[in-house]
Amino acid sequence: FEGFLPQKTGRAPRLAALAEEPRTMIIYESPYRVAKTLRQLAEAFGSDRRCAACREISKLHEECVRGTLEEVAAHFEANEPRGEFVLIVEGRGKA
């Protein structure tokens, strides 16, 4: 569980460190930053890393978009994100 990522100071080093993690990561994000964060994750982790972006969990408008970081980022660039997000990102596979 990572919670919210650092906004400015320390964000790039934190993403670089997380890119090497073998565990599944859970990250919180606001609708205003979710597409940007997904793009940054794709750059740091590789665009083919799988993820799920879930919003409004246990509420009326619950939605979960699954795919690669690239696909999910493109989805939220084309469709305005609403609600609070939980990003679930797969860990690094064995090389």
Label the model's feature ranges.
Residues F1-E21:
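Class I SAM-dependent methyltransferase SAM-binding "motif I" and its flanking Rossmann-like core
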Residues R23-A95:
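A contiguous loop/helix-start segment that scaffolds small-molecule binding in enzyme catalytic cores
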